[in-house]
Structure formats: structure tokens, C-alpha cells
Regions:
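Short, surface-exposed loop/turn motifs at beta-strand boundaries within globular domains
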Residues: 39, 47-52, 60, 69-71, ...
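Residue-level marker of beta-strand positions
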Residues: 64, 83, 103-105
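Tight coil/turn sites that cap or link beta-strands
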Residues: 59-62, 101
Length: 148
């Protein structure tokens, strides 16, 4: 794909499960290709103005949010405790445990991005609030649905 060495500086969470694409099914590889420029970083766009986009991600146990691309500086906050599995465009797979209120911040330089999915592997609903800063080094990706 592309150079992902900058990812080592991002606050990626969780336990590293896999480091290459060998464990990925073909449908998942296809999804990452088809969604490689998908800026829908949440399941519902709650608010947008000239400074920020505020998203919600709400996943039932076993549910996943498809591959999507982050290009804007952003942060997420876990609304409740839970667990997820994430596949990342560099082939890594991580399993992550979250505490309620846990927050992580991400910064992207020009041309940098994070392409990943998220699946709820816990026993309870997993809810996040994600805030993207529109005044970042990269232009915002266009939104196709926004699910507002």
C-alpha cells in the first residue's frame, strides 16, 4: 500500500494480533480497496460546522464498521467499556479493550492517513464519539451519506 512508518508515532491501542495480510479473508481485502477513500468515520454524523465534524459509532456485539480513512486530526472517546478488533491498512490486526471515558488523539501530517475498520468483539454495545478537526493539514474527504 503506502509507507506506514508514521503509524508508530500514533497512539494505536491494544494487543498486536497479526502483522501481515495472511489472516485477512479476500472479502476484507476487497472492502479495504473499495473503501480506501471513505471519509465516513462513524455510523452517524451528529454535527458539522466550519471547524469540526462530530460522529457517533454505535456497534452491537459482533457488529463492525467498515473500512474508513482518517486524514483529519481527530480524537475519539469511548462512551462505555468494551472490546474491539481492528484491521489496519498496513496488515496489522489489533484487539483493544476500552474503559469508559478513555480518549485518544491523532494528528496527521500532509499526505498521512489511517485506514482501518472496527468490530465489536465484546459482550456489550460499544459506543464512541469521534471529533474531526476540519482545519487539519489534509483536506476533508467528501461525505457520501453522512447518516445524519
Amino acid at each position: 500500500m503506502t509507507d506506514s512508518s508514521f503509524l508508530s508515532d500514533l497512539p494505536l491501542a491494544g494487543e498486536l494480533i497479526s502483522t501481515n495480510f495472511d489472516s485477512w479473508p479476500e472479502w476484507l481485502k476487497t472492502e479495504f480497496t473499495e473503501h480506501s477513500h471513505d471519509g465516513e468515520v462513524g455510523s452517524r454524523l451528529l454535527s458539522e460546522n466550519d471547524r469540526v465534524r462530530v460522529w457517533e459509532i454505535r456497534l452491537a456485539p459482533g457488529e463492525r464498521w467498515h473500512a474508513h480513512r482518517h486524514v483529519l486530526d481527530y480524537f475519539w472517546t469511548a462512551i462505555n467499556a468494551g472490546r474491539s478488533r481492528q484491521h489496519t491498512f498496513d496488515g496489522t490486526v489489533r484487539e483493544v479493550s476500552y474503559d469508559a471515558g478513555e480518549t485518544r488523539h491523532f494528528h496527521f501530517g500532509p499526505g498521512e492517513y489511517l485506514l482501518h475498520d472496527i468490530e465489536n468483539i465484546g459482550d456489550t454495545e460499544l459506543i464512541f464519539s469521534t471529533v474531526e478537526h476540519l482545519d487539519s493539514a489534509n483536506a476533508p474527504l467528501p461525505l457520501t451519506t453522512g447518516r445524519k
